[in-house]
Amino acid sequence: QRQMCIRDSGDVEQLTNVPILGELPLCGHKSSDKGTIVVRENKNDMMEETFRGLRTNLLFMLRKDQKVILFSSTQPGEGKSFVTGNLAVSLAYLGKKVVVVGMDIRKPGLNKVFDLSKRQEGISNYLMDPEDKDLFDLVQPSGISPNLDILLGGTIPPNPTELVARDTLEKAIEQLKSRYDYVLLDTAPIGMVTDTAIISRVADMCVYVCRADVTPKAAFCYINVLRDEHKFDKLAVVI
């Protein structure tokens, strides 16, 4: 089984020429811990360092006017929400205004990462009813840094794919861009539902997360399809 999975950056480099933003050390945090934010202010451990390096590489790849970063992966359990959340915290500590948006509307992973309850309204409530909902009323402070806010996925709608296909999504993202330096979208695994491919239209960059000994090599190769279809202006991998 393990031969079939990605083991390290060497494997990734054999499978694709998409640049690698960084390789995270294995995290000792059990998922039962309160949230899984490991980046803390003024703390220098290996995880911290790695996310700082990740942040530097990310900012280097983005042009000044590129603010929207989409995070995806091949399948669930690859650490996509973990990477999104911690990179967001790292950017916030750099003094950037950041909002993380839970676009994996079917299975909200951000709630776990930030230790928030599942039953709150979020982006889906705005997309369903943009006339009556104020988007910024649905945004909540992260409680971690004053620079970081969270916009959860919200109520699970009967038709997530149709919902994210509406041009209301563009309107929502434009509003967020007017108030934040960076908008991070935590989306569904791209191999599983079409939502993420549809959401790609509002993103400047895709960070594709894979996990050592979890992500199958065959499935990971889908990243080359994303590269060849030019769905994203920029594309990079985190292991």
Task: Name each region found by the language model.
Residues 105, 150-152:
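Structured cytosolic domains appended to multi-pass membrane proteins
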Residues 1-97, 103-120, 124, 129-132, ...:
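Short boundary/hinge segments that flank catalytic cores
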Residues 81, 102, 186, 204:
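Conserved G/P- and acidic residue-centered "switch" motifs that form tight phosphate/ATP-binding loops
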Residues 58, 153-193:
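Phosphate-binding/switch loop-helix module in NTP-utilizing enzymes
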Residues 97, 182, 205-208, 236:
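Well-ordered beta-strand positions
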Residues 195-213:
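Inter-motif core of Ras-like GTPase G domains
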Residues 127, 167, 198-200:
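NTP-binding/hydrolysis catalytic cores, primarily Walker-type P-loop NTPases
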